[in-house]
């Protein structure tokens, strides 16, 4: 891995079957997101949907207990694009969120390059940063849950970034901004073990660790009309929904 201004996604090689499930049409206003929308990605998707005249894949949703709403589990930008284009319905697959075959993990950002500018920008936002005394003490999820992020570096560097969801959002925005400015290469890991191994082998320079949210936490965030930063949740379903190409005419 080398170069600046790039984004690399690292996921373990797994075989997940594609399954056809006939989508149902759900009112766009009955859906609650749990992650922020990325404006550039939303714009691109709106253009794609408008030009193709279809929504290629259904979004994944689950009923929210106690209210007449659904949580967007996967497909935030498809939902937002359909809504922005003025359509009233969106094709969806309803799942049992608490089924043990539906897994919830998080993404772990990492950088290849210098961290100095990033730390400066975080401090400018008034976010408290402390050096860790020993990184082994902060690697467990119960310890990670006390901070927005714990950053560990290849030379046994360790920084604790205090805060929670709001601070994670600020740090994530700074990570993306400096990446776009060519300050470093940004890598997102789907598995902590692989990220730690790459750090040990010198393939990345700094790794950002955090506690994965629980399913109940995700639902509560949505119910409070709050959202996590992009690439906070990583949902793993027992299947990949097949392309169904729902025509836009059906969504009016």
Curated annotation (Swiss-Prot):
Keywords: ATP-binding, Kinase, Magnesium, Metal-binding, Nucleotide-binding, Transferase. GO terms for molecular function: ATP binding; kinase activity; metal ion binding. InterPro entries: Chromosome_partition/occlusion, ParB/Sulfiredoxin_dom, ParB/Sulfiredoxin_sf, SerK/SbnI_C, SerK_C. O-phospho-L-serine binds at residues 73, 75-77, 107, 231, 233, 235. Activity levels steadily increase with increases in pH from 6.5 to 11.0. The keyword Magnesium applies. It catalyses: L-serine + ATP = O-phospho-L-serine + ADP + H(+). Maximum activity is observed with Mg(2+), and activity is also detected in the presence of Ca(2+), Zn(2+) or Fe(2+). Its EC number is 2.7.1.225. It is an enzyme of class 2 (transferase). One of its GO terms (cellular component) is chromosome. Induction: Constitutively expressed. Activity increases with increasing temperature up to 95 degrees Celsius. Pfam families: ParBc, SerK_C. Its cofactor is Mg(2+). Mg(2+) binds at residue 74. One of its GO terms (biological process) is chromosome segregation. The active site is at residue 35. Free serine kinase that uses ATP to phosphorylate L-serine to yield O-phospho-L-serine and ADP. Can use ATP, UTP, CTP, GTP and the inorganic polyphosphates triphosphate and tetraphosphate as phosphate donors, with a preference for nucleoside 5'-triphosphates, but cannot use ADP. The catalytic efficiency is highest for ATP. Is specific for L-serine and cannot phosphorylate structurally similar compounds such as D-serine, L-threonine, L-homoserine, hydroxypyruvate, 3-hydroxypropionate and DL-glycerate. Likely contributes to serine metabolism, including cysteine biosynthesis. Belongs to the SerK family. Monomer. This is ATP-dependent L-serine kinase. It comes from Staphylothermus marinus (strain ATCC 43588 / DSM 3639 / JCM 9404 / F1).
